[in-house]
């Protein structure tokens, strides 16, 4: 869905699209060739989605945001999306920004740059009254030539929240004045404060009433009113609270109006335990999991590709009704003078009465380089 609906933007989104078209799935869809943008704000800006549909379920919100983030990012960005999703979910019951930050730090690896940055910014905000000085400290230690880099921008956002005094206008203007990725810094801070204040307070304090919005994604909405978007967010939230395993139902009443397409009877997923890149005379192994929720036994096979030898981990892969199985595919690249960048394979399972399920996956042919020099 993310691939189909997301507009064809550059940066990390473009690298995700290219990797997905190569058959590469998360987490490597957010890693391969994405060195410059992998730590960008493209996924932390999506964190509010998970926090708002899972009020007071911060660990689940953080977990889902991690899945979301690995589509097109890696490492620091994903950590900070988890951190922000936790804060948003927790903000349904806590309004103190310092408390929210401290609680959300629990999902950050303590040896990560993300944890260090959050700790630094909160300490600097306690030590210094001048937000411009704090901004210079953030740039000095975490500044990056990519204006969307998450470390500097989440640092700015935290500073603005801590120094904005809960005033959504002051905080938003400060975030914009800080520069860099301002739609994200003002957006993240504004969404969190808006949640804490609520629609009634926004109108009373600032005269902010229902308004319209614009999006660049490819889908149709019943309207472009923020109130309708909020209403639909609540509906999705009720559905998650009612149906997601382990979710604590924090909202009473309300009708679950979300109808999802039926789950497929057979689900196949592939996992890369090693990078999905291959060269001549090399081999890699791809792991698969399959769930058969049908009433029929299914059996599977593998389609190969020129220049490759492919082997299943067993001579025959059969999965009984209402059961699951795991298997492996070993891909050997023959000795060759050239290798395509995009190499798509397919695992297909079939059962009686026309039951079929297929999973396409890819490996990337490593590039060959010819080095000249050195020259004096």
Where are these regions (language model features)?
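Short, solvent-exposed loop/linker segments at the N-terminal edge
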Residues: 275-282
